[in-house]
Amino acid sequence: MAIKFENVSYVYSPGSPLEAIGLDQLNFSLEEGKFIALVGHTGSGKSTLMQHFNALLKPTSGKIEIAGYTITPETGNKGLKDLRRKVSLAFQFSEAQLFENTVLKDVEYGPRNFGFSEDEAREAALKWLKKVGLKDDLIEHSPFDLSGGQMRRVALAGVLAYEPEIICLDEPAAGLDPMGRLEMMQLFKDYQAAGHTVILVTHNMDDVADYADDVLALEHGRLIKHASPKEVFKDSEWLQKHHLAEPRSARFAAKLEAAGLKLPGQPLTMPELADAIKQSLKGGEHE
């Protein structure tokens, strides 16, 4: 089942001096089970769009179809709990969502809230705390005694513990060390591979190149491109015009070509770049 947005607009504080357009006539369809990246300059509407996926914000006009639900401006709050069981959001600095006395209780809260038994909630919490890499000896600690990176892991375990069909993540690996970042992004890719949809809000174009199947690029609340990573990154002038960076591998490939090494294809990731260099050197295509 696809995720569909039809003529969706959102206006902040309509009719007031503070009125501002958050989303402007968005039309797109996303295939479920994919890893989708939302990109755009600061203020482009990424976080506003993310909050529409589970009706935390409802459109001012237009229609959204997601997880078997239809969301319009007239949609009430009744029944949204089940939608939010299926579609979960993890905000930037998700550690601010922590509130329980212990790590374990905090991660158990989501499953319990959505009908898990006490034993089921505990089992789910322990499973996901292990998956996010938190040590067993920390589960009875207060989450507020942990480091920032550990708190981030606990918060993410909390939204993964009830295994929503669709998870929306706003810069989830920001602030983690390089190894922690790699582990966390691989966790999300594995979650997608298990049959879920992952929607990632990010400024990190390496993550887009490495993990995304599909990209939505926003600017001033408008959808300016919906394409694969290769399509999005093939035009460096377009990227510069819209204040979007290229992946590091693409930038390095451009420097190599400027130095006279002709590379096959369009390498966007480090493995692709390494393969392209090997092929070029093997074929004697460098000058």
Swiss-Prot record:
It is a peripheral membrane protein. Keywords: ATP-binding, Cell membrane, Membrane, Nucleotide-binding, Translocase, Transport. InterPro entries: AAA+_ATPase (IPR003593), ABC_transporter-like_ATP-bd (IPR003439), ABC_transporter-like_CS (IPR017871), ABC_transpr_CbiO/EcfA_su (IPR015856), ECF_ABC_transporter_ATP-bd (IPR050095), EcfA2 (IPR030946), P-loop_NTPase (IPR027417). It is an enzyme of class 7 (translocase). Its EC number is 7.-.-.-. ATP binds at residues 40-47. Pfam families: ABC_tran. The keyword Cytoplasm does not apply. The keyword DNA repair does not apply. It is found in: Cell membrane. This is Energy-coupling factor transporter ATP-binding protein EcfA2. It comes from Lactobacillus delbrueckii subsp. bulgaricus (strain ATCC 11842 / DSM 20081 / BCRC 10696 / JCM 1002 / NBRC 13953 / NCIMB 11778 / NCTC 12712 / WDCM 00102 / Lb 14).
